[in-house]
C-alpha cells in the first residue's frame, strides 16, 4: 500500500476532528486557505540554515516551500551566516548585499529589510540611505542584540524610518536565565515607541515569553506583536487578538530557524475569524508597508 502526503493529511485531519479539534482549525492540502487566497506575507524571515551556496540558491529553496504553503511574499533580513556580535560596517554591508541579491533574483516573492548595528550611528544612517532611501529595501530589522533598543542610539535610526514611513522589526526576548548583554525585551520596545509615537515598531518574537510580551506592549498602540520564532503553541494568536486586536498582530516565521508550516499553523489553527486571520497573515503588514511601497512604485 502506498501512502502519499495527501492521504496522511486527510488522516491527520480526521483524527484531530474526532478528538474535538474544530474542523476549521485543521489545514489539509485542499484547504482553500493555502491556495493563495489569504495572501500570506511573512514579515520575519532569514536565509540562514538553508541549503545553497549563494543567496539566490537559498532563496530558491524558500520559494519552493512558500509555494507549498501558499505564501505570497517574504520580508527578508540578515542571517545568511551565524549571528555575529558587534558586527562591523563591512559585515553589515555584506549581509545587506546578500539580502538585496536574493530579492533581485525573486522580486515578486520577497522584499528586503535593513540590518543595522546601532553601535555605529553614522554608518547606520549611510546604510539607510543606500539600501532604503536610494535602494530597494522597504523595512528596518531585524535589529538584534548589542544595543538595547531603548537606548538613545536608536533615535536617529527611528527618525529616518519615520521620514519614509518604513516599519521597524526589533528582536526581543525575555529569557528565564537572563538576556544577552544588549538584548532587548518588550519593555525596551515600549520605551522606544513612546519616544517616537509616529513610528511603527514590530516587537520581534513578542519577547518569546509571549504571555508577558503581549501584556507589556498592550497599551502602546504603535507597537505590533510578531508571532515568529516560537513553538506553535495553542493560545498565542488568540491571546494577542484578544488583548491587542487583530490589527496589531503580524505573522512571521523566523525561517530558516523555524519552518513555515509550524508558524503558519499558529494562525490557521487559531480559534479566531477568517477575517482576523487574513489581517494577521498579510493584511496588516501590507498596510504598514503601503506608504513606502507606493513611494517606490512597488507591488502591494
Over which residues does each language-model region extend?
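Active-site neighborhood of phospho(di)ester-bond hydrolases with catalytic His/Asp-centered motifs
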Residues: 41-43, 76-77, 113-115, 141, ...
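Acidic/histidine-rich helix-loop elements
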Residues: 46-57, 83-88
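Alpha-helical scaffolding within the catalytic cores
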Residues: 57-62, 94-99, 124-126, 187-189, ...
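Active-site gating/metal-coordination segments in enzymes
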Residues: 72-73, 82, 89-170, 174-176, ...
Amino acid at each position: 500500500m502506498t501512502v502519499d502526503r495527501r492521504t496522511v493529511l486527510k488522516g491527520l485531519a480526521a483524527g484531530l476532528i474526532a478528538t474535538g479539534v474544530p474542523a476549521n482549525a485543521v489545514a489539509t492540502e485542499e484547504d482553500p486557505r493555502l491556495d493563495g487566497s489569504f495572501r500570506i506575507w511573512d514579515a520575519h524571515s532569514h536565509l540562514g540554515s538553508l541549503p545553497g551556496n549563494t543567496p539566490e540558491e537559498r532563496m530558491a529553496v524558500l520559494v519552493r516551500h512558500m509555494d507549498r504553503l501558499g505564501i505570497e511574499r517574504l520580508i527578508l533580513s540578515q542571517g545568511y551566516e551565524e549571528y555575529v556580535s558587534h558586527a562591523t560596517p563591512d559585515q553589515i554591508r555584506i549581509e545587506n548585499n546578500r539580502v538585496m541579491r536574493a530579492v533581485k533574483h525573486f522580486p515578486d516573492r520577497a522584499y528586503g529589510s535593513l540590518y543595522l548595528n546601532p553601535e555605529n550611528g553614522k554608518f547606520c544612517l549611510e546604510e539607510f540611505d543606500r539600501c532604503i532611501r536610494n535602494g530597494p529595501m522597504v523595512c528596518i530589522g531585524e535589529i538584534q542584540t548589542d544595543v538595547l533598543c531603548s537606548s538613545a542610539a536608536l533615535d536617529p535610526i527611528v527618525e529616518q524610518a519615520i521620514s519614509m514611513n518604513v516599519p521597524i522589526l526589533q528582536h526581543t526576548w525575555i529569557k528565564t536565565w537572563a538576556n544577552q548583554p544588549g538584548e532587548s525585551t518588550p519593555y525596551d520596545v515600549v520605551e522606544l515607541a513612546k519616544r517616537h509615537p509616529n513610528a511603527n515598531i514590530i516587537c520581534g518574537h513578542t519577547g518569546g515569553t509571549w504571555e508577558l510580551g503581549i501584556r507589556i506592549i498592550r497599551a502602546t498602540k504603535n507597537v505590533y506583536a510578531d508571532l515568529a520564532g516560537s513553538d506553535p503553541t495553542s493560545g498565542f494568536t488568540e491571546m494577542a487578538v484578544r488583548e491587542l486586536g487583530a490589527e496589531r498582530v503580524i505573522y512571521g516565521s523566523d525561517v530558516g530557524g523555524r519552518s513555515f508550516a509550524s508558524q503558519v499553523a499558529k494562525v490557521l489553527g487559531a480559534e479566531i475569524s477568517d477575517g482576523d486571520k487574513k489581517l494577521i497573515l498579510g493584511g496588516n503588514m501590507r498596510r504598514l508597508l503601503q506608504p513606502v511601497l507606493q513611494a517606490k512604485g512597488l507591488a502591494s
